[in-house]
């Protein structure tokens, strides 16, 4: 598992830095303003990206008791998806990190080192 360092988006922009997704999954430190961009450069294979909910039952005064499940989204060949932001009370593990895993959509097998799935974590500074 690799830890991805979030990149700050500023008025001057940001140079994207897509990293190859790690077969065992990836993680990033989450403050609640981060989102992820995942790009599939494969010509035909699709992948399913899962963000693991660490707290599956929580309470919000306005809505009452809520149940949260993992978020899974497919990224088809040649496409990009964006996910987030991630509420820390739901998504952060004991180390304050969000956990992300990847499988092939066709057979749910774990990705291998030869896949073409890329990820970056971005955030806007909140003032």
Predicted regions and their residues:
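Surface-exposed, low-hydrophobicity beta-strand/loop segments enriched in small/polar/acidic residues
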Residues: 2-127
């Amino acid at each position: 598992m690799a830890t991805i360092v979030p990149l700050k988006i500023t008025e001057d922009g940001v140079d994207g830095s897509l990293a190859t997704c790690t077969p065992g999954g990836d993680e990033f430190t989450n403050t609640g303003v981060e989102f992820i961009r995942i790009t599939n450069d494969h010509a035909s294979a699709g992948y399913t990206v899962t963000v693991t909910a660490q707290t599956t039952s929580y309470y919000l005064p306005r809505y009452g008791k809520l149940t949260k499940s993992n978020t899974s989204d497919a990224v088809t060949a040649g496409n990009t998806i964006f996910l987030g932001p991630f509420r820390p009370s739901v998504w952060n593990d004991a180390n304050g990190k969000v956990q992300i895993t990847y499988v092939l959509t066709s057979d749910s097998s774990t990705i291998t080192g030869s896949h073409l799935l890329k990820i970056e974590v971005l955030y806007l500074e909140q003032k």
